[in-house]
Amino acid sequence: MATPNKRQLSKISSSYIALGVILITLTAILGTSIFMRINEIRIEGTSLYSIEEVVEASGLSAGRNLFLINPQSVSSRIREELPFVSAANIKRILPDTVVIEVTESPAAGIVNFSGERYVIDSEGRVLAMISGEDFSLHGLVIDDLIEIRGLEIDDATIGRTLRAEFGAETRLQNMQDILAAMAREGIIPDVSYIDVSNSANLHFGYLGIYRVVLGERRHLRQKLEVLVPTVEDIVHRHPNTPGDINMTEVTDVTNRVKFQPT
């Protein structure tokens, strides 16, 4: 009987190794399919939507394979179905849990487009369309939202950022920057309107009695950072006096503000 040579032994060894790898892979897949199934779905960070709404929007359910879900697809589905969600982070926790961390976008303003009114967040993303006068969604009070004036809009698709008409892109950018700065300073609830019709004369209504004149967009952050202490001083010196707060001369090196009673 012939004895296998080294080359034949090497081929036999390689075959056994390959077979072993295949068996291990199949065992791992089988084990994952049988044991790594979703038993619990936890939702964190939601206040505008119920846990059931987020779970339904995710498309996940108990019994699905934990490792066969696509986190990016799940996140996209949630953001498409629930416009007030700006981000959804999907985490797997062995052996059987999925955690969905939701970040919501608070409503900030209202814009008019094609005879309808749309709710937007501080980044200019459209959250909802207002239907009729008796609008109610997630406890929103329409009168508490900022009216955006002087912006020509080309598209207002729910879940997407506003698109300005050709030539009005700068106005849209001005609005986004102002809203973002207001959100940082926490003053959005105190603002009644923002007028972006003139990029050299940006202004907004504040606390119901003041018109805050920003002028150009330059030094916007500095202007809004000094607004609250400026108003506190004005209230002390001119109680209950409406007027214009001119911040056009505020820069990163000076906080020169003028108040003109009206």
Model regions and ranges:
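Charged, solvent-exposed interaction patches on well-folded alpha/beta domains
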Residues: 2-32, 36, 53, 57, ...
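Extended, alpha-helix-rich binding/interface surfaces that flank or overlap catalytic cores
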Residues: 43
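Short extracytoplasmic
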Residues: 49-76, 80
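Extracytoplasmic/periplasmic mature domains of Sec-exported, cell-envelope-associated bacterial proteins
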Residues: 71, 75, 81-89, 97-99
